[in-house]
Protein backbone atom coordinates (compact mmCIF):
# COMPACT_ATOMS: atom_id res chain seq x y z
CA UNK A 1 0.00 0.00 0.00
CA UNK A 2 1.47 3.33 -1.06
CA UNK A 3 2.11 5.75 1.80
CA UNK A 4 1.45 9.46 1.31
CA UNK A 5 4.10 11.79 2.76
CA UNK A 6 3.85 15.44 3.80
CA UNK A 7 7.22 17.18 3.87
CA UNK A 8 8.56 18.58 7.14
CA UNK A 9 8.38 22.33 7.73
CA UNK A 10 11.26 24.73 7.27
CA UNK A 11 12.04 27.79 9.37
CA UNK A 12 12.59 28.59 13.03
CA UNK A 13 11.96 25.43 15.06
CA UNK A 14 13.44 24.15 18.31
CA UNK A 15 14.22 20.72 16.86
CA UNK A 16 16.12 21.28 13.64
CA UNK A 17 17.76 17.90 12.98
CA UNK A 18 15.95 14.95 14.54
CA UNK A 19 18.59 12.30 13.88
CA UNK A 20 21.47 14.39 15.23
CA UNK A 21 19.51 15.40 18.34
CA UNK A 22 18.35 11.85 19.00
CA UNK A 23 21.84 10.40 18.68
CA UNK A 24 23.51 12.97 20.98
CA UNK A 25 20.71 13.42 23.54
CA UNK A 26 21.40 13.17 27.29
CA UNK A 27 18.80 13.74 30.03
CA UNK A 28 21.55 15.36 32.15
CA UNK A 29 21.69 18.22 29.64
CA UNK A 30 17.95 18.87 30.06
CA UNK A 31 18.38 19.32 33.82
CA UNK A 32 20.26 22.58 33.15
CA UNK A 33 16.95 24.26 32.21
CA UNK A 34 15.75 24.03 35.82
CA UNK A 35 16.72 25.97 38.92
CA UNK A 36 17.14 22.72 40.88
CA UNK A 37 20.14 21.79 38.73
CA UNK A 38 22.00 24.41 40.82
CA UNK A 39 20.00 24.60 44.07
CA UNK A 40 18.99 20.96 44.51
CA UNK A 41 15.50 22.25 45.47
CA UNK A 42 12.74 20.75 43.32
CA UNK A 43 9.05 21.58 43.06
CA UNK A 44 6.94 21.37 39.90
CA UNK A 45 4.83 24.44 40.75
CA UNK A 46 7.93 26.57 41.32
CA UNK A 47 9.43 25.52 37.99
CA UNK A 48 6.14 26.17 36.18
CA UNK A 49 5.43 29.62 37.64
CA UNK A 50 7.80 31.17 40.20
CA UNK A 51 10.97 30.41 38.23
CA UNK A 52 9.75 32.60 35.38
CA UNK A 53 8.90 35.43 37.78
CA UNK A 54 12.38 35.16 39.30
CA UNK A 55 13.85 35.33 35.80
CA UNK A 56 12.04 38.58 34.97
CA UNK A 57 8.99 37.26 33.11
CA UNK A 58 6.43 38.13 35.79
CA UNK A 59 4.47 40.47 33.51
CA UNK A 60 4.08 37.90 30.73
CA UNK A 61 0.59 36.42 30.30
CA UNK A 62 0.57 32.90 31.73
CA UNK A 63 -3.15 32.09 31.45
CA UNK A 64 -5.91 33.23 29.11
CA UNK A 65 -9.35 31.97 30.13
CA UNK A 66 -12.69 32.20 28.37
CA UNK A 67 -16.16 30.74 28.84
CA UNK A 68 -19.71 31.93 28.26
CA UNK A 69 -19.51 34.37 31.18
CA UNK A 70 -15.84 35.16 31.77
CA UNK A 71 -12.87 36.30 29.74
CA UNK A 72 -9.74 36.81 31.86
CA UNK A 73 -5.97 36.90 31.61
CA UNK A 74 -3.40 36.30 34.35
CA UNK A 75 0.33 37.06 34.29
CA UNK A 76 2.98 34.77 35.73
CA UNK A 77 3.15 37.16 38.70
CA UNK A 78 -0.63 36.83 39.15
CA UNK A 79 -0.35 33.05 39.04
CA UNK A 80 2.45 33.11 41.62
CA UNK A 81 0.38 35.27 43.96
CA UNK A 82 -2.87 33.31 43.52
CA UNK A 83 -1.24 29.88 43.82
CA UNK A 84 0.49 31.07 47.01
CA UNK A 85 -2.89 32.14 48.37
CA UNK A 86 -4.36 28.76 47.43
CA UNK A 87 -1.48 26.96 49.15
CA UNK A 88 -2.11 28.97 52.32
CA UNK A 89 -5.85 28.24 52.26
CA UNK A 90 -5.24 24.52 51.79
CA UNK A 91 -2.46 24.18 54.34
CA UNK A 92 -4.11 26.32 57.05
CA UNK A 93 -7.78 25.40 56.66
CA UNK A 94 -7.74 21.95 55.02
CA UNK A 95 -4.57 20.90 56.88
CA UNK A 96 -2.90 19.62 53.70
CA UNK A 97 0.64 18.33 54.26
CA UNK A 98 3.43 16.93 52.12
CA UNK A 99 2.47 13.57 50.59
CA UNK A 100 -1.28 13.91 51.21
CA UNK A 101 -3.54 13.01 48.30
CA UNK A 102 -5.69 15.99 47.33
CA UNK A 103 -8.22 15.40 44.56
CA UNK A 104 -9.70 18.10 42.34
CA UNK A 105 -13.21 17.46 41.03
CA UNK A 106 -14.50 20.63 39.45
CA UNK A 107 -15.33 22.40 36.22
CA UNK A 108 -12.59 24.04 34.19
CA UNK A 109 -12.11 27.55 35.60
CA UNK A 110 -9.03 29.58 36.59
CA UNK A 111 -9.61 28.59 40.22
CA UNK A 112 -8.87 24.95 39.35
CA UNK A 113 -5.40 25.95 38.21
CA UNK A 114 -4.73 28.15 41.25
CA UNK A 115 -5.76 25.27 43.50
CA UNK A 116 -3.74 22.63 41.66
CA UNK A 117 -0.58 24.72 41.81
CA UNK A 118 -1.27 25.40 45.48
CA UNK A 119 -1.50 21.68 46.21
CA UNK A 120 1.87 21.14 44.51
CA UNK A 121 3.53 24.01 46.39
CA UNK A 122 2.63 22.26 49.66
CA UNK A 123 4.31 19.09 48.39
CA UNK A 124 1.05 17.13 48.31
CA UNK A 125 0.07 14.74 45.52
CA UNK A 126 -2.68 16.03 43.26
CA UNK A 127 -5.39 13.70 41.95
CA UNK A 128 -7.38 15.03 38.97
CA UNK A 129 -10.97 13.88 38.47
CA UNK A 130 -13.02 14.45 35.30
CA UNK A 131 -16.07 16.57 36.08
CA UNK A 132 -18.45 14.16 34.28
CA UNK A 133 -17.62 11.30 36.68
CA UNK A 134 -20.60 9.96 38.59
CA UNK A 135 -20.68 8.71 42.19
CA UNK A 136 -19.09 5.27 41.77
CA UNK A 137 -16.18 6.57 39.67
CA UNK A 138 -15.50 9.30 42.24
CA UNK A 139 -15.80 6.91 45.19
CA UNK A 140 -13.51 4.27 43.66
CA UNK A 141 -10.70 6.76 43.14
CA UNK A 142 -11.00 8.57 46.47
CA UNK A 143 -11.23 5.31 48.39
CA UNK A 144 -8.26 3.60 46.71
CA UNK A 145 -6.01 6.67 47.06
CA UNK A 146 -7.11 7.33 50.67
CA UNK A 147 -7.60 10.94 49.65
CA UNK A 148 -7.54 13.35 52.58
CA UNK A 149 -9.00 16.44 50.86
CA UNK A 150 -11.35 17.04 47.93
CA UNK A 151 -11.66 20.35 46.08
CA UNK A 152 -14.95 20.62 44.20
CA UNK A 153 -17.96 22.73 43.13
CA UNK A 154 -21.42 22.80 44.74
CA UNK A 155 -23.01 21.23 41.66
CA UNK A 156 -20.75 18.17 41.93
CA UNK A 157 -21.12 17.61 45.70
CA UNK A 158 -24.10 15.21 45.33
CA UNK A 159 -21.78 12.80 43.51
CA UNK A 160 -19.40 12.57 46.49
CA UNK A 161 -20.51 9.76 48.88
CA UNK A 162 -18.85 11.22 51.98
CA UNK A 163 -20.24 8.55 54.33
CA UNK A 164 -18.36 5.85 52.37
CA UNK A 165 -15.02 7.69 52.49
CA UNK A 166 -13.61 7.60 56.04
CA UNK A 167 -10.21 8.96 54.95
CA UNK A 168 -11.74 12.10 53.42
CA UNK A 169 -11.26 14.71 56.16
CA UNK A 170 -12.02 18.01 54.42
CA UNK A 171 -14.01 19.23 51.42
CA UNK A 172 -13.07 22.56 49.86
CA UNK A 173 -15.85 24.15 47.79
CA UNK A 174 -15.05 26.64 45.03
CA UNK A 175 -18.31 28.59 44.73
CA UNK A 176 -20.38 31.41 46.15
CA UNK A 177 -22.52 30.94 49.30
CA UNK A 178 -20.75 27.88 50.68
CA UNK A 179 -22.32 26.01 53.62
CA UNK A 180 -20.52 26.20 56.96
CA UNK A 181 -19.48 22.53 57.04
CA UNK A 182 -17.30 23.03 53.95
CA UNK A 183 -14.19 25.15 53.42
CA UNK A 184 -15.08 28.30 51.45
CA UNK A 185 -12.21 28.60 48.97
CA UNK A 186 -13.18 31.88 47.30
CA UNK A 187 -13.82 33.80 50.55
CA UNK A 188 -10.63 32.52 52.15
CA UNK A 189 -8.59 33.38 49.06
CA UNK A 190 -9.49 37.05 49.54
CA UNK A 191 -7.80 37.28 52.93
CA UNK A 192 -5.03 34.67 52.51
CA UNK A 193 -1.40 35.76 52.39
CA UNK A 194 0.11 35.90 48.91
CA UNK A 195 3.45 34.64 50.20
CA UNK A 196 4.16 30.97 50.81
CA UNK A 197 7.23 28.93 51.69
CA UNK A 198 7.34 26.27 48.98
CA UNK A 199 8.01 22.68 50.09
CA UNK A 200 11.22 21.55 48.39
CA UNK A 201 11.18 17.96 47.21
CA UNK A 202 13.32 15.16 45.84
CA UNK A 203 13.12 13.87 42.28
CA UNK A 204 11.20 10.76 43.35
CA UNK A 205 8.65 12.52 45.58
CA UNK A 206 5.03 12.17 44.46
CA UNK A 207 3.58 14.65 41.97
CA UNK A 208 0.30 13.43 40.50
CA UNK A 209 -1.94 10.37 40.76
CA UNK A 210 -3.95 9.58 37.62
CA UNK A 211 -6.49 6.78 37.54
CA UNK A 212 -6.76 4.85 34.30
CA UNK A 213 -9.35 2.22 33.40
CA UNK A 214 -8.81 -1.21 31.91
CA UNK A 215 -11.05 -3.91 30.51
CA UNK A 216 -11.22 -5.68 33.88
CA UNK A 217 -11.18 -4.70 37.53
CA UNK A 218 -11.16 -1.33 39.21
CA UNK A 219 -9.36 1.73 37.81
CA UNK A 220 -5.69 1.75 38.78
CA UNK A 221 -3.80 4.68 40.27
CA UNK A 222 -0.73 5.61 38.22
CA UNK A 223 1.73 7.67 40.28
CA UNK A 224 4.17 10.07 38.63
CA UNK A 225 6.92 11.90 40.50
CA UNK A 226 8.64 15.29 40.34
CA UNK A 227 11.30 14.29 37.80
CA UNK A 228 8.55 13.81 35.19
CA UNK A 229 9.04 17.52 34.50
CA UNK A 230 12.09 16.64 32.39
CA UNK A 231 9.88 14.90 29.82
CA UNK A 232 7.14 17.54 30.03
CA UNK A 233 9.69 20.28 29.40
CA UNK A 234 11.64 18.72 26.53
CA UNK A 235 8.55 17.43 24.72
CA UNK A 236 7.03 20.90 25.06
CA UNK A 237 10.17 22.24 23.43
CA UNK A 238 10.73 19.65 20.69
CA UNK A 239 7.22 18.33 19.95
CA UNK A 240 4.89 21.23 20.75
CA UNK A 241 7.71 23.50 19.55
CA UNK A 242 6.87 26.13 22.20
CA UNK A 243 8.77 29.37 21.67
CA UNK A 244 8.89 32.74 23.39
CA UNK A 245 5.93 34.38 21.65
CA UNK A 246 3.65 31.36 21.33
CA UNK A 247 0.07 31.29 22.56
CA UNK A 248 -0.82 27.68 23.24
CA UNK A 249 -4.15 25.90 23.66
CA UNK A 250 -4.58 22.29 24.76
CA UNK A 251 -8.26 21.35 24.60
CA UNK A 252 -7.98 18.35 26.96
CA UNK A 253 -9.77 18.43 30.29
CA UNK A 254 -7.43 18.61 33.33
CA UNK A 255 -9.19 15.53 34.68
CA UNK A 256 -7.17 13.51 32.17
CA UNK A 257 -3.42 13.10 31.82
CA UNK A 258 -3.19 15.21 28.64
CA UNK A 259 -4.92 18.06 30.43
CA UNK A 260 -2.22 18.08 33.11
CA UNK A 261 0.97 16.98 31.33
CA UNK A 262 0.23 19.17 28.30
CA UNK A 263 -2.51 21.49 29.52
CA UNK A 264 -0.51 22.66 32.57
CA UNK A 265 3.03 21.38 32.99
CA UNK A 266 4.60 21.47 29.51
CA UNK A 267 3.44 24.98 28.50
CA UNK A 268 4.28 26.59 31.83
CA UNK A 269 7.62 24.82 32.20
CA UNK A 270 8.45 26.38 28.84
CA UNK A 271 7.19 29.84 29.87
CA UNK A 272 4.39 29.92 27.29
CA UNK A 273 1.06 31.73 27.34
CA UNK A 274 -1.49 28.99 28.05
CA UNK A 275 -5.16 29.16 27.03
CA UNK A 276 -8.06 27.44 28.79
CA UNK A 277 -11.63 27.21 27.48
CA UNK A 278 -14.48 26.58 29.89
CA UNK A 279 -17.88 25.23 28.92
CA UNK A 280 -18.87 22.64 26.36
CA UNK A 281 -17.59 22.08 22.84
CA UNK A 282 -19.03 23.95 19.89
CA UNK A 283 -17.26 24.80 16.62
CA UNK A 284 -18.13 28.46 17.09
CA UNK A 285 -16.70 28.60 20.60
CA UNK A 286 -13.51 26.84 19.59
CA UNK A 287 -12.87 28.95 16.52
CA UNK A 288 -13.57 32.16 18.46
CA UNK A 289 -11.09 30.98 21.12
CA UNK A 290 -8.35 30.76 18.48
CA UNK A 291 -9.35 34.11 16.98
CA UNK A 292 -9.72 36.02 20.27
CA UNK A 293 -6.44 34.91 21.83
CA UNK A 294 -4.50 34.55 18.56
CA UNK A 295 -3.60 30.95 19.38
CA UNK A 296 -0.47 29.78 17.57
CA UNK A 297 -0.19 26.14 18.74
CA UNK A 298 -3.28 24.00 19.14
CA UNK A 299 -3.23 20.53 20.76
CA UNK A 300 -6.48 18.60 20.39
CA UNK A 301 -7.96 15.17 19.63
CA UNK A 302 -9.04 13.35 16.46
CA UNK A 303 -12.61 13.20 17.76
CA UNK A 304 -12.71 17.00 18.02
CA UNK A 305 -11.20 17.37 14.56
CA UNK A 306 -13.81 14.98 13.14
CA UNK A 307 -16.56 17.02 14.82
CA UNK A 308 -15.14 20.19 13.28
CA UNK A 309 -14.90 18.35 9.97
CA UNK A 310 -18.59 17.40 10.16
CA UNK A 311 -19.48 21.05 10.93
CA UNK A 312 -18.26 21.85 7.42
CA UNK A 313 -15.67 24.02 5.75
CA UNK A 314 -17.83 27.15 5.43
CA UNK A 315 -17.85 27.97 9.16
CA UNK A 316 -14.05 28.24 9.11
CA UNK A 317 -14.31 31.23 6.77
CA UNK A 318 -16.14 33.24 9.46
CA UNK A 319 -13.10 33.31 11.76
CA UNK A 320 -9.56 34.62 11.53
CA UNK A 321 -7.40 31.58 12.26
CA UNK A 322 -4.29 32.99 10.62
CA UNK A 323 -2.39 33.01 13.93
CA UNK A 324 -2.20 29.18 13.91
CA UNK A 325 1.20 27.77 13.02
CA UNK A 326 0.91 24.23 14.40
CA UNK A 327 -1.82 21.67 15.17
CA UNK A 328 -1.16 18.47 17.12
CA UNK A 329 -3.37 15.55 18.03
CA UNK A 330 -3.59 13.02 20.87
CA UNK A 331 -5.85 10.33 22.30
CA UNK A 332 -6.23 7.94 19.41
CA UNK A 333 -4.50 7.46 16.04
CA UNK A 334 -5.17 9.98 13.31
CA UNK A 335 -6.98 8.64 10.28
CA UNK A 336 -5.37 9.85 7.03
CA UNK A 337 -8.71 11.38 6.01
CA UNK A 338 -8.58 13.76 8.99
CA UNK A 339 -4.97 14.72 8.20
CA UNK A 340 -5.97 15.56 4.62
CA UNK A 341 -8.95 17.63 5.77
CA UNK A 342 -6.84 19.62 8.24
CA UNK A 343 -4.31 20.29 5.48
CA UNK A 344 -7.06 21.44 3.11
CA UNK A 345 -8.93 23.67 5.57
CA UNK A 346 -6.21 25.05 7.86
CA UNK A 347 -3.21 24.68 5.54
CA UNK A 348 -1.25 22.83 8.23
CA UNK A 349 -0.04 19.27 8.78
CA UNK A 350 -1.60 17.93 11.97
CA UNK A 351 1.03 16.08 14.02
CA UNK A 352 0.01 12.87 15.77
CA UNK A 353 1.46 12.07 19.21
CA UNK A 354 1.49 8.69 20.97
CA UNK A 355 1.83 8.18 24.70
CA UNK A 356 -0.33 7.01 27.57
CA UNK A 357 -1.11 7.68 31.21
CA UNK A 358 1.59 5.23 32.31
CA UNK A 359 4.33 6.94 30.25
CA UNK A 360 3.52 10.40 31.67
CA UNK A 361 4.52 12.22 28.48
CA UNK A 362 5.20 11.95 24.76
CA UNK A 363 6.96 8.77 23.61
CA UNK A 364 6.52 8.42 19.82
CA UNK A 365 5.49 11.49 17.86
CA UNK A 366 5.59 13.45 14.64
CA UNK A 367 7.74 16.60 14.64
CA UNK A 368 7.27 19.91 12.79
CA UNK A 369 10.53 19.56 10.83
CA UNK A 370 10.26 15.84 10.05
CA UNK A 371 8.42 14.33 7.08
CA UNK A 372 5.01 12.97 8.12
CA UNK A 373 3.94 9.61 6.75
CA UNK A 374 0.15 9.80 6.82
CA UNK A 375 -1.18 7.38 9.44
CA UNK A 376 2.18 6.82 11.15
CA UNK A 377 2.85 7.44 14.85
CA UNK A 378 6.20 9.02 13.95
CA UNK A 379 9.49 8.42 15.76
CA UNK A 380 10.59 8.27 19.44
CA UNK A 381 11.23 11.39 21.49
CA UNK A 382 14.97 12.03 21.99
CA UNK A 383 15.91 10.16 25.16
CA UNK A 384 13.33 7.44 24.52
CA UNK A 385 14.28 4.00 23.18
CA UNK A 386 11.28 2.31 21.54
CA UNK A 387 11.07 -1.08 19.87
CA UNK A 388 8.73 -3.77 18.63
CA UNK A 389 9.25 -6.93 20.69
CA UNK A 390 7.80 -10.42 20.87
CA UNK A 391 6.28 -11.92 24.00
CA UNK A 392 9.73 -13.04 25.19
CA UNK A 393 11.22 -9.53 24.96
CA UNK A 394 13.17 -10.06 21.73
CA UNK A 395 13.29 -7.13 19.29
CA UNK A 396 11.56 -7.83 15.98
CA UNK A 397 12.81 -6.77 12.53
CA UNK A 398 11.13 -4.02 10.45
CA UNK A 399 7.56 -4.58 9.24
CA UNK A 400 6.80 -7.31 11.81
CA UNK A 401 3.81 -6.63 14.03
CA UNK A 402 4.42 -7.11 17.74
CA UNK A 403 4.33 -5.44 21.16
CA UNK A 404 5.16 -1.73 21.22
CA UNK A 405 7.65 -1.33 24.06
CA UNK A 406 9.78 1.41 25.67
CA UNK A 407 13.12 0.76 27.41
CA UNK A 408 12.42 1.57 31.05
CA UNK A 409 14.05 4.39 33.00
CA UNK A 410 12.80 7.58 31.33
CA UNK A 411 11.97 10.39 33.84
CA UNK A 412 8.17 10.41 33.44
CA UNK A 413 7.73 6.63 33.60
CA UNK A 414 5.06 5.69 36.13
CA UNK A 415 6.68 5.31 39.53
CA UNK A 416 4.19 2.81 40.90
CA UNK A 417 0.62 1.58 40.67
CA UNK A 418 -0.99 2.80 43.87
CA UNK A 419 -1.21 -0.04 46.41
CA UNK A 420 -0.76 -2.66 43.66
CA UNK A 421 2.90 -3.67 43.17
CA UNK A 422 1.97 -6.88 41.34
CA UNK A 423 0.07 -4.92 38.69
CA UNK A 424 3.09 -2.65 38.27
CA UNK A 425 5.39 -5.62 37.65
CA UNK A 426 3.00 -6.98 35.02
CA UNK A 427 3.80 -4.05 32.70
CA UNK A 428 7.39 -5.17 32.15
CA UNK A 429 9.24 -7.86 30.22
CA UNK A 430 12.85 -7.58 31.34
CA UNK A 431 13.96 -3.98 30.76
CA UNK A 432 11.00 -3.20 28.50
CA UNK A 433 7.81 -1.41 29.49
CA UNK A 434 5.18 -3.16 27.35
CA UNK A 435 2.47 -0.71 26.32
CA UNK A 436 -0.28 -3.16 25.44
CA UNK A 437 -0.40 -1.63 21.96
CA UNK A 438 0.39 -3.58 18.82
CA UNK A 439 2.49 -1.89 16.15
CA UNK A 440 5.28 -2.35 13.65
CA UNK A 441 8.30 -0.26 12.70
CA UNK A 442 9.11 0.33 9.04
CA UNK A 443 12.55 0.37 7.44
CA UNK A 444 12.80 4.16 7.93
CA UNK A 445 12.23 3.94 11.69
CA UNK A 446 8.62 5.17 11.65
CA UNK A 447 6.20 3.34 13.96
CA UNK A 448 2.71 2.27 12.85
CA UNK A 449 -0.05 1.67 15.41
CA UNK A 450 -2.22 -1.41 14.80
CA UNK A 451 -4.48 -1.45 17.84
CA UNK A 452 -4.42 -2.79 21.36
CA UNK A 453 -2.72 -6.18 21.56
CA UNK A 454 -5.99 -7.65 22.82
CA UNK A 455 -7.75 -6.14 19.78
CA UNK A 456 -5.50 -7.62 17.07
CA UNK A 457 -7.51 -10.11 15.05
CA UNK A 458 -6.24 -13.50 13.86
CA UNK A 459 -8.37 -14.51 10.89
CA UNK A 460 -7.49 -17.59 8.84
CA UNK A 461 -3.90 -17.35 10.09
CA UNK A 462 -3.51 -13.65 9.22
CA UNK A 463 -2.96 -10.91 11.82
CA UNK A 464 -5.13 -7.86 11.16
CA UNK A 465 -4.72 -4.59 13.08
CA UNK A 466 -8.10 -2.96 13.72
CA UNK A 467 -6.97 0.62 13.17
CA UNK A 468 -6.00 0.04 9.54
CA UNK A 469 -9.42 -1.42 8.77
CA UNK A 470 -11.25 1.31 10.70
CA UNK A 471 -9.30 3.98 8.82
CA UNK A 472 -10.36 2.46 5.51
CA UNK A 473 -13.98 2.20 6.62
CA UNK A 474 -14.22 5.90 7.52
CA UNK A 475 -12.85 6.83 4.10
CA UNK A 476 -16.13 5.57 2.63
CA UNK A 477 -18.52 8.47 2.07
CA UNK A 478 -21.41 6.96 4.03
CA UNK A 479 -19.41 6.06 7.15
CA UNK A 480 -19.11 8.53 10.04
CA UNK A 481 -17.48 6.20 12.60
CA UNK A 482 -16.37 2.60 12.66
CA UNK A 483 -15.07 0.06 15.16
CA UNK A 484 -14.06 -3.52 14.46
CA UNK A 485 -13.65 -6.62 16.58
CA UNK A 486 -12.64 -10.22 16.08
CA UNK A 487 -15.66 -12.50 16.39
CA UNK A 488 -15.00 -16.19 17.15
CA UNK A 489 -15.52 -18.42 14.12
CA UNK A 490 -15.19 -22.23 14.00
CA UNK A 491 -13.46 -22.22 10.61
CA UNK A 492 -11.32 -19.07 10.56
CA UNK A 493 -10.59 -18.72 14.26
CA UNK A 494 -11.98 -15.19 14.09
CA UNK A 495 -13.80 -13.14 11.52
CA UNK A 496 -13.79 -9.36 11.30
CA UNK A 497 -17.01 -7.73 12.40
CA UNK A 498 -17.50 -4.00 11.87
CA UNK A 499 -19.83 -1.71 13.80
CA UNK A 500 -20.64 1.35 11.71
CA UNK A 501 -22.37 4.66 12.42
CA UNK A 502 -23.61 6.29 9.22
CA UNK A 503 -23.46 9.91 8.16
CA UNK A 504 -26.71 11.86 7.93
CA UNK A 505 -28.62 11.12 4.76
CA UNK A 506 -27.68 7.44 4.48
CA UNK A 507 -30.04 4.55 5.22
CA UNK A 508 -28.83 1.24 6.68
CA UNK A 509 -29.41 -1.38 3.97
CA UNK A 510 -27.93 -4.74 3.01
CA UNK A 511 -26.81 -3.19 -0.26
CA UNK A 512 -24.84 -0.55 1.62
CA UNK A 513 -23.20 -3.24 3.77
CA UNK A 514 -21.94 -4.97 0.65
CA UNK A 515 -20.69 -1.71 -0.86
CA UNK A 516 -18.72 -0.98 2.32
CA UNK A 517 -17.30 -4.51 2.45
CA UNK A 518 -16.12 -4.32 -1.16
CA UNK A 519 -14.60 -0.89 -0.56
CA UNK A 520 -12.39 -2.32 2.20
CA UNK A 521 -11.60 -5.46 0.20
CA UNK A 522 -10.46 -3.43 -2.80
CA UNK A 523 -8.64 -0.83 -0.72
CA UNK A 524 -6.84 -3.19 1.69
CA UNK A 525 -7.21 -6.91 1.08
CA UNK A 526 -9.77 -9.69 1.09
CA UNK A 527 -8.77 -10.98 4.53
CA UNK A 528 -9.08 -7.45 6.01
CA UNK A 529 -12.64 -6.93 4.73
CA UNK A 530 -15.37 -7.28 7.37
CA UNK A 531 -17.44 -10.45 6.99
CA UNK A 532 -20.16 -8.93 9.15
CA UNK A 533 -21.31 -5.31 9.38
CA UNK A 534 -23.78 -3.99 11.95
CA UNK A 535 -25.15 -0.46 11.82
CA UNK A 536 -25.41 1.52 15.08
CA UNK A 537 -26.72 5.02 15.78
CA UNK A 538 -23.54 5.74 17.75
CA UNK A 539 -20.48 3.84 18.93
CA UNK A 540 -19.20 3.59 22.51
CA UNK A 541 -16.30 5.98 23.04
CA UNK A 542 -14.18 7.16 25.93
CA UNK A 543 -14.46 10.82 26.85
CA UNK A 544 -11.15 11.35 25.06
CA UNK A 545 -12.66 9.95 21.87
CA UNK A 546 -11.32 6.40 21.57
CA UNK A 547 -13.68 3.77 20.21
CA UNK A 548 -14.17 1.27 23.05
CA UNK A 549 -13.68 -2.01 21.20
CA UNK A 550 -13.98 -4.01 24.41
CA UNK A 551 -17.54 -2.68 24.77
CA UNK A 552 -18.31 -3.67 21.18
CA UNK A 553 -16.95 -7.14 21.94
CA UNK A 554 -19.00 -7.34 25.13
CA UNK A 555 -22.13 -6.42 23.18
CA UNK A 556 -21.43 -9.07 20.60
CA UNK A 557 -20.52 -11.89 22.99
CA UNK A 558 -22.80 -10.96 25.92
CA UNK A 559 -19.84 -10.34 28.22
CA UNK A 560 -19.25 -7.93 31.11
CA UNK A 561 -17.84 -4.72 29.61
CA UNK A 562 -15.79 -3.90 32.72
CA UNK A 563 -15.33 -0.38 34.11
CA UNK A 564 -17.39 2.12 32.08
CA UNK A 565 -16.62 5.26 34.10
CA UNK A 566 -14.66 6.74 31.19
CA UNK A 567 -17.38 6.13 28.57
CA UNK A 568 -19.07 9.26 27.28
Summary of predicted features, one role per range:
Residues 45, 59-117, 134-139, 184-190, ...:
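Conserved AMP-binding/adenylate-forming core of the ANL superfamily
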Residues 59-61, 173-176, 189-211, 218, ...:
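Conserved pre-ATP/AMP-binding loop-to-beta segment of ANL
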Residues 136-143, 148-154, 291, 298, ...:
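AMP-binding/adenylate-forming catalytic core of the ANL superfamily
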Residues 380-383, 394-426, 462-464:
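Conserved ATP/PPi-binding loop(s) of AMP-dependent carboxylate-activating enzymes
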Amino acid sequence: MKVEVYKGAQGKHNLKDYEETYNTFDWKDVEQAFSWSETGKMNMAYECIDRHVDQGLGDKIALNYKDEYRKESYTYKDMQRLSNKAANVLSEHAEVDKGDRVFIFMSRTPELYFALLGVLKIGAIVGPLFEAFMEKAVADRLENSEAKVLITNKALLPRVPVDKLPNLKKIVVVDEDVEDNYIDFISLMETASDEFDIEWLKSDDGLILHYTSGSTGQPKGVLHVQQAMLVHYISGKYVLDLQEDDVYWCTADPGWVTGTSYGIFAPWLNGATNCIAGGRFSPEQWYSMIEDFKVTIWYTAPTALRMLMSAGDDIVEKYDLSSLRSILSVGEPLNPEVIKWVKKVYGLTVLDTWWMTETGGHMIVNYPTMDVKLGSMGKPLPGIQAAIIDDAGNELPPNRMGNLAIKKGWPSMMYRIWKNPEKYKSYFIGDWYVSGDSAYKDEDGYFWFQGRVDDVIMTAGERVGPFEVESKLVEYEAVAEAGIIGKPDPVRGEIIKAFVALRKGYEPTDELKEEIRLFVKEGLSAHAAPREIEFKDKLPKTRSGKIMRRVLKAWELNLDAGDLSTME
